[in-house]
């Protein structure tokens, strides 16, 4: 039943003008919700500042103008052009046999001659690497009680075997209460409530970034702390205890995610789309466990000194003072 419903959406959607108008209102409300949440908005601002006018630099939700100007024909033509069998991946997790799933999917997708559709696979271009040699600051004025910042730089691409070391480095720097930045910014100085880091991998590049929300009067101090911590780790690496804690946290998070069938389904589907194969879960855990202090020192020394980009949402009208901090 579920496969029938989903396959019907994929193969036989009519996409009426009424449907588009109804969804347009929903997306506009989603944009409004994003704009009212500075901690969310700052990530889109960072992407725009870092990647500029590229596919990955533009907001996934679109803009108010682009959503308002989107016609039914635009949506329908995109659907007919992109929703093709050669780009389709079906991922299923649960108590069901693989052969039965294959038979059900083939039967469902054979309707309306969907499997006979021809077309070129969707182009997945490499993500552009930031090529500016100058640091950049993206600033969005918003009258708020807190300043929200995202400080990031170039990371590794998704096919880079160092992505496991990058994940451990990210966790050690800002992955939890024992992480270096959390301790320095929140526990020692009480400058922020929310402090975290994450690494993202794309086709041709990646991003390693750090978020903090703080009192606007303390924003420069927080930026300076981030820079000092990253500089220290780039020069000296991290302690054995920090690395082992981070590895344990990354492994634990992955294991817990596999308790849910939906998460398992998402993992194998994304693996197939991104890598063309499903990486064995135990192999992933082993790859994380193999990350050494030398790996962390090398990747930190290479990437934490990259030219930074800083995105800020808060009651600031001039980015010059932040540019001066980055230039030091």
PLM feature segments, named:
Residues 4-6, 46, 83, 151, ...:
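Active/ligand-binding-proximal structured segments within catalytic/core domains
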Residues 13-31, 97, 118-130, 228, ...:
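Acidic/histidine-enriched alpha-helical segments
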Residues 1-38, 76-84:
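Active-site-adjacent, His/Asp/Glu-enriched structural segments that form or flank metal-binding
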Residues 76-80, 136-141, 194-200, 299:
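Short beta-strand/turn micro-motifs at beta-sheet edges
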Residues 67-77:
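Active-site glycine-rich loop that binds ribose-phosphate moieties when present
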């Amino acid at each position: 039943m579920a496969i029938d419903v989903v396959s019907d959406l994929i193969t036989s959607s009519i996409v009426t003008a009424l449907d588009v108008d109804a969804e347009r209102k929903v997306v506009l409300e989603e944009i409004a919700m994003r704009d009212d949440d500075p901690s969310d908005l700052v990530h889109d601002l960072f992407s725009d500042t870092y990647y500029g006018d590229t596919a990955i630099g533009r907001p996934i939700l679109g803009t108010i103008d682009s959503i308002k100007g989107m016609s039914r024909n635009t949506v329908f033509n995109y659907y007919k052009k992109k929703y093709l069998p050669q780009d389709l991946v079906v991922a299923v997790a649960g108590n069901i046999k693989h052969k039965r799933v294959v038979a059900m999917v083939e039967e469902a997708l054979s309707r309306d001659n969907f499997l006979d559709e021809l077309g070129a696979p969707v182009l997945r271009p490499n993500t552009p690497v930031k090529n500016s040699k100058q640091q950049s600051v993206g600033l969005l004025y918003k009258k708020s009680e807190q300043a929200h910042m995202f400080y990031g730089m170039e990371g590794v691409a998704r096919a880079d075997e160092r992505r496991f070391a990058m994940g451990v480095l990210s966790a050690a720097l800002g992955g939890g209460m024992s992480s270096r930045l959390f301790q320095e910014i929140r526990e020692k100085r009480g400058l922020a409530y929310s402090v975290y880091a994450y690494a993202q991998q794309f086709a041709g590049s990646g991003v390693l970034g750090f978020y903090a929300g703080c009192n606007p009067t303390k924003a420069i101090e927080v930026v300076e702390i981030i820079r000092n911590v990253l500089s220290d780790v780039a020069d000296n690496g991290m302690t054995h205890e920090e690395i082992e804690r981070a590895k344990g946290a990354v492994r634990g998070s992955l294991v817990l995610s596999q308790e849910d069938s939906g998460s398992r389904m998402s993992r194998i589907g994304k693996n197939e789309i991104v890598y063309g194969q499903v990486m064995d879960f135990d192999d992933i855990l082993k790859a994380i466990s193999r990350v050494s202090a030398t790996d962390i020192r090398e990747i930190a020394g290479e990437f934490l000194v990259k030219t930074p980009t800083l995105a800020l949402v808060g009651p600031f009208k001039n980015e010059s003072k932040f540019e001066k901090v980055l230039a030091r």
